[in-house]
Amino acid sequence: MHCHVKTWGAIHQKSVKSTSVNSALYVLYNVLGKRRGEVNAMEKLIITACICGAEVTKEHNPAVPYTVEEIAKEAKSAYDAGASIIHLHVREDDGTPTQSKERFEACINAIKEVCPDVIIQPSTGGAVGMSNEERLAPTTLRPEMATLDCGTCNFGGDEIFVNTENMIIDFANTMNEYGIKPEIEVFDKGMVDMAIRLHKKGYIKAPMHFDFVMGVNGGISGEPRDLLFMANSIPAGSTWTVSGVGRFEYPMVTMGILMGGHV
Protein backbone atom coordinates (compact mmCIF):
# COMPACT_ATOMS: atom_id res chain seq x y z
CA MET A 1 0.00 0.00 0.00
CA HIS A 2 1.42 3.35 -0.99
CA CYS A 3 0.56 6.94 -0.27
CA HIS A 4 3.15 8.39 -2.62
CA VAL A 5 4.42 8.32 -6.16
CA LYS A 6 6.86 5.45 -6.47
CA THR A 7 8.81 7.30 -9.10
CA TRP A 8 8.61 9.50 -12.14
CA GLY A 9 11.26 9.60 -14.85
CA ALA A 10 12.10 10.30 -18.44
CA ILE A 11 13.36 6.79 -19.13
CA HIS A 12 11.00 4.22 -20.67
CA GLN A 13 12.85 0.89 -20.47
CA LYS A 14 16.04 2.65 -21.50
CA SER A 15 19.60 1.38 -20.99
CA VAL A 16 22.01 2.94 -18.50
CA LYS A 17 25.14 3.84 -20.47
CA SER A 18 27.02 6.56 -18.57
CA THR A 19 30.66 5.76 -17.70
CA SER A 20 30.21 7.42 -14.30
CA VAL A 21 27.14 5.28 -13.65
CA ASN A 22 29.05 2.15 -14.67
CA SER A 23 31.81 3.04 -12.21
CA ALA A 24 29.27 3.59 -9.45
CA LEU A 25 27.65 0.25 -10.22
CA TYR A 26 31.01 -1.49 -9.91
CA VAL A 27 31.75 0.13 -6.56
CA LEU A 28 28.29 -0.45 -5.10
CA TYR A 29 28.11 -4.09 -6.09
CA ASN A 30 31.47 -4.73 -4.48
CA VAL A 31 30.26 -2.96 -1.33
CA LEU A 32 27.35 -5.41 -1.25
CA GLY A 33 29.92 -8.14 -0.72
CA LYS A 34 27.87 -10.79 -2.49
CA ARG A 35 28.05 -11.00 -6.28
CA ARG A 36 24.88 -12.27 -7.94
CA GLY A 37 26.26 -12.80 -11.41
CA GLU A 38 27.91 -10.24 -13.65
CA VAL A 39 26.68 -6.66 -13.43
CA ASN A 40 25.12 -5.75 -16.75
CA ALA A 41 24.99 -1.97 -17.10
CA MET A 42 22.90 -2.38 -20.25
CA GLU A 43 19.93 -3.95 -18.47
CA LYS A 44 16.71 -1.99 -18.91
CA LEU A 45 15.48 0.25 -16.12
CA ILE A 46 11.82 -0.45 -15.29
CA ILE A 47 9.92 2.50 -13.83
CA THR A 48 6.78 2.00 -11.74
CA ALA A 49 4.47 4.96 -11.10
CA CYS A 50 2.01 5.08 -8.21
CA ILE A 51 -0.34 7.79 -9.39
CA CYS A 52 -2.55 8.40 -6.37
CA GLY A 53 -1.98 6.08 -3.38
CA ALA A 54 -4.66 5.37 -0.81
CA GLU A 55 -4.31 8.18 1.72
CA VAL A 56 -3.08 11.35 0.01
CA THR A 57 -5.85 13.82 -0.90
CA LYS A 58 -6.26 16.86 -3.12
CA GLU A 59 -5.84 18.91 0.05
CA HIS A 60 -2.29 17.56 0.22
CA ASN A 61 -1.73 17.94 -3.53
CA PRO A 62 -4.36 19.21 -6.00
CA ALA A 63 -2.91 16.93 -8.70
CA VAL A 64 -3.98 13.72 -6.90
CA PRO A 65 -6.46 11.99 -9.25
CA TYR A 66 -9.84 10.73 -8.01
CA THR A 67 -12.10 10.16 -11.01
CA VAL A 68 -11.65 7.50 -13.68
CA GLU A 69 -10.78 10.21 -16.19
CA GLU A 70 -8.22 11.83 -13.88
CA ILE A 71 -6.59 8.49 -13.10
CA ALA A 72 -6.32 7.59 -16.80
CA LYS A 73 -4.85 11.02 -17.57
CA GLU A 74 -2.20 10.71 -14.85
CA ALA A 75 -1.37 7.16 -15.94
CA LYS A 76 -0.86 8.36 -19.52
CA SER A 77 1.32 11.22 -18.28
CA ALA A 78 3.47 8.79 -16.27
CA TYR A 79 3.66 6.38 -19.20
CA ASP A 80 4.75 9.16 -21.57
CA ALA A 81 7.39 10.20 -19.03
CA GLY A 82 8.83 6.69 -18.89
CA ALA A 83 6.75 4.42 -16.66
CA SER A 84 6.34 0.80 -17.74
CA ILE A 85 4.16 -0.21 -14.75
CA ILE A 86 1.24 1.61 -13.15
CA HIS A 87 0.83 0.74 -9.47
CA LEU A 88 -2.87 1.32 -9.08
CA HIS A 89 -4.99 2.46 -6.17
CA VAL A 90 -8.47 3.75 -7.05
CA ARG A 91 -10.84 6.26 -5.47
CA GLU A 92 -14.48 7.19 -5.54
CA ASP A 93 -15.17 10.54 -7.18
CA ASP A 94 -15.05 12.23 -3.76
CA GLY A 95 -11.59 10.78 -3.07
CA THR A 96 -12.64 7.94 -0.77
CA PRO A 97 -10.28 4.94 -1.16
CA THR A 98 -12.00 1.86 -2.54
CA GLN A 99 -11.11 -1.68 -3.59
CA SER A 100 -14.29 -2.03 -5.65
CA LYS A 101 -13.81 -4.50 -8.49
CA GLU A 102 -16.05 -2.34 -10.69
CA ARG A 103 -14.02 0.81 -10.00
CA PHE A 104 -10.75 -0.99 -10.70
CA GLU A 105 -12.18 -2.41 -13.92
CA ALA A 106 -13.31 1.03 -15.09
CA CYS A 107 -9.91 2.56 -14.32
CA ILE A 108 -7.94 -0.29 -15.90
CA ASN A 109 -10.02 -0.11 -19.07
CA ALA A 110 -9.57 3.66 -19.25
CA ILE A 111 -5.80 3.34 -18.77
CA LYS A 112 -5.49 0.59 -21.38
CA GLU A 113 -7.38 2.81 -23.86
CA VAL A 114 -4.61 5.43 -23.76
CA CYS A 115 -1.56 3.21 -23.11
CA PRO A 116 -2.46 -0.37 -24.08
CA ASP A 117 0.95 -1.94 -23.41
CA VAL A 118 1.50 -0.55 -19.91
CA ILE A 119 1.53 -3.15 -17.11
CA ILE A 120 -1.21 -2.62 -14.52
CA GLN A 121 -0.35 -3.53 -10.93
CA PRO A 122 -3.34 -3.12 -8.58
CA SER A 123 -2.72 -2.71 -4.89
CA THR A 124 -4.04 -5.43 -2.61
CA GLY A 125 -3.01 -3.30 0.36
CA GLY A 126 -5.97 -1.02 -0.13
CA ALA A 127 -6.35 1.24 2.88
CA VAL A 128 -5.94 0.54 6.60
CA GLY A 129 -9.02 -1.22 7.99
CA MET A 130 -10.21 -2.92 4.80
CA SER A 131 -11.14 -6.62 4.95
CA ASN A 132 -9.23 -9.36 3.14
CA GLU A 133 -12.12 -9.78 0.72
CA GLU A 134 -12.13 -6.06 -0.10
CA ARG A 135 -8.38 -6.00 -0.59
CA LEU A 136 -8.41 -9.02 -2.93
CA ALA A 137 -11.31 -7.80 -5.08
CA PRO A 138 -9.17 -6.46 -7.99
CA THR A 139 -7.35 -9.79 -8.37
CA THR A 140 -10.51 -11.29 -9.89
CA LEU A 141 -9.81 -9.08 -12.91
CA ARG A 142 -6.61 -11.12 -13.47
CA PRO A 143 -4.21 -8.19 -13.92
CA GLU A 144 -0.61 -8.83 -14.95
CA MET A 145 0.72 -8.01 -11.46
CA ALA A 146 -0.50 -7.17 -7.96
CA THR A 147 1.17 -6.27 -4.69
CA LEU A 148 1.78 -8.88 -1.99
CA ASP A 149 2.52 -7.26 1.38
CA CYS A 150 4.65 -9.60 3.47
CA GLY A 151 4.23 -8.31 7.00
CA THR A 152 2.42 -6.08 9.46
CA CYS A 153 3.52 -2.48 10.01
CA ASN A 154 2.67 0.29 12.51
CA PHE A 155 1.79 3.26 10.31
CA GLY A 156 1.45 5.69 13.21
CA GLY A 157 -1.02 6.49 15.96
CA ASP A 158 -3.49 3.62 16.11
CA GLU A 159 -3.14 2.69 12.42
CA ILE A 160 -1.84 -0.85 11.93
CA PHE A 161 -1.43 -2.30 8.44
CA VAL A 162 -2.20 -5.94 9.22
CA ASN A 163 -0.76 -8.82 7.20
CA THR A 164 -0.57 -12.04 9.21
CA GLU A 165 1.25 -15.07 7.84
CA ASN A 166 -2.04 -16.81 7.03
CA MET A 167 -3.28 -13.69 5.24
CA ILE A 168 -0.13 -13.54 3.14
CA ILE A 169 -0.52 -17.23 2.22
CA ASP A 170 -4.16 -16.62 1.25
CA PHE A 171 -3.21 -13.63 -0.91
CA ALA A 172 -0.33 -15.56 -2.53
CA ASN A 173 -2.58 -18.54 -3.29
CA THR A 174 -5.15 -16.24 -4.88
CA MET A 175 -2.50 -14.67 -7.11
CA ASN A 176 -1.20 -18.09 -8.11
CA GLU A 177 -4.74 -19.20 -8.98
CA TYR A 178 -5.28 -16.19 -11.24
CA GLY A 179 -1.82 -16.24 -12.82
CA ILE A 180 -0.83 -12.89 -11.31
CA LYS A 181 2.84 -12.02 -10.75
CA PRO A 182 3.21 -10.67 -7.20
CA GLU A 183 5.32 -7.66 -6.41
CA ILE A 184 6.54 -8.55 -2.92
CA GLU A 185 6.16 -5.36 -0.93
CA VAL A 186 8.48 -5.18 2.07
CA PHE A 187 8.84 -2.43 4.66
CA ASP A 188 11.66 -4.00 6.65
CA LYS A 189 14.09 -6.95 6.68
CA GLY A 190 11.70 -9.23 8.57
CA MET A 191 9.26 -9.04 5.66
CA VAL A 192 12.00 -10.17 3.28
CA ASP A 193 12.58 -13.18 5.54
CA MET A 194 8.85 -13.92 5.57
CA ALA A 195 8.73 -13.88 1.76
CA ILE A 196 11.72 -16.21 1.53
CA ARG A 197 10.15 -18.60 4.04
CA LEU A 198 6.88 -18.70 2.09
CA HIS A 199 8.82 -19.20 -1.14
CA LYS A 200 10.53 -22.24 0.38
CA LYS A 201 7.08 -23.58 1.32
CA GLY A 202 5.91 -23.16 -2.27
CA TYR A 203 3.49 -20.27 -1.84
CA ILE A 204 5.58 -17.66 -3.68
CA LYS A 205 7.14 -18.73 -6.96
CA ALA A 206 10.59 -17.86 -8.28
CA PRO A 207 11.87 -15.60 -9.61
CA MET A 208 10.73 -13.29 -6.83
CA HIS A 209 10.31 -9.57 -7.47
CA PHE A 210 10.65 -7.31 -4.42
CA ASP A 211 9.66 -3.70 -3.81
CA PHE A 212 11.70 -2.14 -1.00
CA VAL A 213 9.46 0.58 0.46
CA MET A 214 11.87 2.77 2.41
CA GLY A 215 11.08 5.35 5.06
CA VAL A 216 7.59 4.19 6.03
CA ASN A 217 6.64 5.02 9.61
CA GLY A 218 7.19 1.77 11.52
CA GLY A 219 9.45 0.29 8.84
CA ILE A 220 13.09 0.54 7.83
CA SER A 221 14.48 4.02 7.20
CA GLY A 222 15.65 5.29 3.82
CA GLU A 223 19.38 5.72 4.35
CA PRO A 224 21.93 4.31 1.86
CA ARG A 225 23.05 1.62 4.32
CA ASP A 226 19.42 0.47 4.61
CA LEU A 227 19.00 -0.08 0.87
CA LEU A 228 22.34 -1.91 0.66
CA PHE A 229 21.21 -4.17 3.52
CA MET A 230 17.84 -4.91 1.90
CA ALA A 231 19.29 -5.57 -1.55
CA ASN A 232 21.87 -7.92 -0.07
CA SER A 233 19.15 -9.89 1.75
CA ILE A 234 17.17 -11.31 -1.18
CA PRO A 235 17.85 -14.62 -2.96
CA ALA A 236 20.01 -14.89 -6.06
CA GLY A 237 17.98 -14.53 -9.22
CA SER A 238 15.47 -12.14 -7.65
CA THR A 239 14.75 -8.68 -9.03
CA TRP A 240 13.96 -5.57 -7.03
CA THR A 241 12.62 -2.07 -7.22
CA VAL A 242 12.83 0.66 -4.60
CA SER A 243 10.52 3.46 -3.55
CA GLY A 244 11.05 6.05 -0.85
CA VAL A 245 8.41 7.81 1.21
CA GLY A 246 8.51 11.60 1.32
CA ARG A 247 12.03 12.99 1.53
CA PHE A 248 13.52 9.54 0.92
CA GLU A 249 12.12 9.23 -2.63
CA TYR A 250 14.83 10.94 -4.68
CA PRO A 251 17.83 9.60 -2.69
CA MET A 252 16.49 6.04 -2.83
CA VAL A 253 15.59 6.23 -6.53
CA THR A 254 19.03 7.63 -7.38
CA MET A 255 20.82 4.96 -5.38
CA GLY A 256 18.57 2.23 -6.76
CA ILE A 257 19.49 3.15 -10.32
CA LEU A 258 23.20 3.23 -9.46
CA MET A 259 22.91 -0.23 -7.89
CA GLY A 260 21.26 -1.68 -10.99
CA GLY A 261 17.80 -2.00 -9.45
CA HIS A 262 14.49 -0.63 -10.69
CA VAL A 263 12.46 2.31 -9.40
Please report, for each region that a protein language model flagged, where it lies by residue.
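Short hydrophobic alpha-helical segments enriched in small aliphatic residues
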Residues: 3-5, 13-27, 31
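N-terminal small/glycine-rich loop or linker at the start of catalytic domains
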Residues: 41-63, 147-154
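Short beta-strand segments at enzyme active-site cores
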Residues: 49, 83-93, 120-124, 184-185
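Active-site mouth loops of central-metabolism enzymes
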Residues: 54-70, 124-130, 157-161, 219, ...
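Glycine-rich, proline-tolerant flexible connector loops at the mouths of alpha/beta enzymes
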Residues: 59, 85-105, 213-214
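Alpha-helix-loop-beta-strand connector modules within alpha/beta enzyme cores
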Residues: 97-122, 171-175, 230-236
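Catalytic alpha/beta core domains of metabolic enzymes, predominantly
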Residues: 145-263
